[in-house]
Amino acid sequence: MNQIILDLQIACVDNQGLPNENDFQLWLSSAISPFKKNAEVTIRLVDEIESRQLNFQYRQIDKPTNVLSFPFISPVQVPLPLLGDLIICRQIVEKEAVLQKKALWAHWAHMVVHGALHLLGYDHILNDDAKKMESIETEIMMYLGYPNPYD
C-alpha cells in the first residue's frame, strides 16, 4: 500500500478560503503514487513576501512565484522516504487563476501536481522534457476530474 505523508504548513497571514488538508493530500498522492510507494512531502503555503525572498535566495529572481520545489537529496547509504518541500504562494495562485480564467481549486491542484513532479525529477527546461512533464500533469489532472491545465 502506498503511503504518501503530507506535512502541511500554512504560513499565510490570512488562512481563510484555502483548500483543506484533504485536498492537498489527494492532489499530492495522485501525483506521487504512480511513481513512488512511500514519500514524505512538506507543502508550505506562503504569502508573496516569503515567496519572493525564497525565489531570490535560491533562484536569484527578485519576485514571488507560484511554486518552488526543493527536492531532498538523500545520502546514498540512507534510504529515506523524504521527497522534498513545495512552497506555494497563495496570492500568485489566486491571481493566476483569475488571469488564466481557471477554476481556483483546479489551479491549486495543478500547482501541487506540477511541484510534485519537480520533486520526482521532472523539469521543463528543454522542449521535449516540457512536453513529457505537461503530458503527465494533464493525465493526473484529468484523473482528478480537472481539465487540461494547458488548454
From Swiss-Prot:
Belongs to the endoribonuclease YbeY family. It comes from Hamiltonella defensa subsp. Acyrthosiphon pisum (strain 5AT). Single strand-specific metallo-endoribonuclease involved in late-stage 70S ribosome quality control and in maturation of the 3' terminus of the 16S rRNA. The gene is ybeY. It is found in: Cytoplasm. Gene3D superfamilies: Metalloproteases ('zincins'), catalytic domain. One of its GO terms (molecular function) is metalloendopeptidase activity. GO terms for cellular component: cytoplasm. This is Endoribonuclease YbeY.
